[in-house]
UniProtKB/Swiss-Prot annotation:
Function statement: Key enzyme in folate metabolism. Contributes to the de novo mitochondrial thymidylate biosynthesis pathway. Catalyzes an essential reaction for de novo glycine and purine synthesis, and for DNA precursor synthesis. Binds its own mRNA.
Oligomer status and interactors: Homodimer.
Keywords, in A-Z order: Acetylation, Cytoplasm, Methotrexate resistance, Mitochondrion, NADP, One-carbon metabolism, Oxidoreductase, RNA-binding
DHFR domain span: 4-185
Gene (UniProt): Dhfr
Binding site for NADP(+): 10, 16-22, 55-57, 77-79, 117-124
GO CC, one annotated term: cytoplasm
Origin: domain of life: Eukaryota
EC number(s) per entry: 1.5.1.3
Catalytic reaction annotation: (6S)-5,6,7,8-tetrahydrofolate + NADP(+) = 7,8-dihydrofolate + NADPH + H(+)
Top-level EC class: oxidoreductase
Name of the protein: Dihydrofolate reductase
Organism taxonomic ancestry: Eukaryota, Metazoa, Chordata, Craniata, Vertebrata
Amino acid sequence: MVRPLNCIVAVSQNMGIGKNGDLPWPLLRNEFKYFQRMTTTSSVEGKQNLVIMGRKTWFSIPEKNRPLKDRINIVLSRELKEPPQGAHFLAKSLDDALKLIEQPELASKVDMVWVVGGSSVYQEAMNQPGHLRLFVTRIMQEFESDTFFPEIDLEKYKLLPEYPGVLSEIQEEKGIKYKFEVYEKKD
């Protein structure tokens, strides 16, 4: 069974997603809660969601928050020989991680699969065949960044007018406006 893949990301107007291993903007508490709710909430009793992230994204999470709780954490790295402390699994690539998820020990435990960064992992996910959703928080301001989100090809991805559990009106925190968007691609 090929399950849909979900990417979740917050991007500034200049498509920035990171700066010096952190977010380019101040912590937006409600945006962070949205990330937690979306990636944690499982629709299937007894199953957990799974998050996939690159090594740099893993180490950008404060140690006290690793692993992301109530979720199965897979870290991608071609260099590491074993999962970093706290991570549940290590895979060499997104393809390897997706194969791992379909192994019997995990297949029965996993509900939704979320890619949570960084750039190259998002790029790899967006190039996957099949059903893909992008949950994009548009931060409606430019922030200096050194890490960016790949271009969303609107020939392939459709912006959905609404999505269950996702607010459609513009949000504001700390003087920063943002909005939640959901894109979908079906091959």
